[in-house]
Amino acid sequence: LALANPVHAPYGRAAVTLLEHLGLLRRKDVPLPGLAKPFPLLSWEEIPWERLTGGVEAYWDATPLRQGKPRFAFVYGENISQTAQLALAATRVGLLALSLAVHESLSGAGAYWLASLGSHLPLEQDYLVLKGRGRPEVLAFYVYVGSPEARAVFRRYGFLLPGE
């Protein structure tokens, strides 16, 4: 199963929490030093993801995912785009961003299932200008991103926008 590495990739964290929500992963009672609560009692937002460097199966029991699949394994992408490539080329199944699943380059590659918003760690994305604030082309891009045309593009690729 291809998924983004949850240690540093937000989509990987959403994938793990989705599998947990569906009952396909169960948290192990493993000690994580320095935490106020035991690992199994932490909310998704409280999990110290950057400290979970042992791989998903060091912290979650994947027995439900293994049933009938003796060769089951997690394959980690460094980001969600690499995870999509792994799903296409190697695993044939993965947990991806909707924006990739509906993209023209993947549209004929298979089917996708849309998870409900409450079934995984939410992913909020922002944009900001780091350099060139005074340049006309930077300002034009900033204005475009908030325009009705750009909002239509975001919706087409599965993004929810503020107020939706």
Predicted segment positions?
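Exported/periplasmic ABC-transporter solute-binding proteins
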Residues: 1-164
